[in-house]
């Protein structure tokens, strides 16, 4: 009996499954009673429960008289991947998966249990020997400081060999295209795939269980769609996939995709990741710095584009100008423009400043779009939310991609990670952070001169400290960033916050449950710093907040109706922010006027105070 103890072994939750099996004359053994400690598990399996289940599964696989009943519950994130690994390990040996929820009927469990037991008995009687698969997939190996690619026929290539190509799925158009351009500048044959569409989603769903999170389904669909559209390819194709060390399911994407490649027997195809373990794919310091610059510029340019969509007199002409600037930046990252980045950005600012505006960018309403990093940035995953808000006069500030890189630095420097670093590594990482901050400040300072971008440095520490009373910083992941950013930005720059995440994403649901309670004046006040102007908003009660999950399908009409109500509430808050701002500006002006009047008329205290400050 496999599964999580709280729903597999608890009689109130398991629908009497152990009793149903035992009453038919079969022994039921909980998996944690098996002596399976000596089995090895994949190093990528970072969930403790997953390690125990996979070890016990190997024990069951070796015993002819043991069969697996896997009890899970609806929308269990880790099980969406563990079930795939479990079935792959069992191979042709039958097993039964029972997914329980509040609608599960007793009769349905009886029927499936009887059918499974009949199949298992037949399997034992037939004594089926599984066929041996002779497929050999390509793979990426780390040879010291060099990355090598081994094709399906055993030939070895370097990463820069013309016979090797790296394909990047769309993870936000600007970010993906810029990273691909930087890889090409290194001599690597890199290609950025276009933004996913409905066909991509369907391809992904056909080759997954559809229970995995949306980013994995879309990226898998993108890869398989590319392979099927290029049947005559003669290169080893490496599919770039982000990874992590848990608890988020992101760290399982690469292993699950490798299983898809093996199952579909796709020759000369492998998964490529960049981590500190493989020296970031052999990228040198200069290319890593370029990647950081590209991510910062991508984040800023997305904000500028949204501002112009609301403020420009001619929206189409303005967005065309942004597109031309972006193509020049891509040429720079590819190494085809021999000009300094600061000069190129200054030229871009001059062109952006010349765009005619019908509204003052500093007075337009701003909505913060936060949540899971892939979904909030990917144009297909978030559907038409950004366009809908812009058409209603709202600038949409999407939480930056660079924020998560800064969070990774924070985790390392705060000692929240499991790995221990040597003194030299710590010094090197501190230098890297200082260089990153210098370039972030430099790029944002230049782009803010256009008047279309508001300068603000990423401060992850401030975000986390502000919500330390809600989430412990040891609970790593995007939940703490989502909660912190929502409460920081509301009433500061934003008149409303939208949190978006994949369907069934645990960090997104944790953040949503907290924000639904805390997105009010009392919650904002609990995280506010001294000197905040929260007293001007006390009559607002609840603050505009809207959370939604996406599975790639079009949003239902109920979501659209809720968005309309959210927009009305956000517009009222924006008007209150403008009133407070105008009142503050006039009060400051009066204070300055009186101050100078005192100085001119010879007021002794005022004059002595000025002399003291001058000294």
Q: What kind of region is each of these model predictions?
A:
Residues 1-615:
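An N-terminal assembly and electron-transfer interface module characteristic of large anaerobic redox
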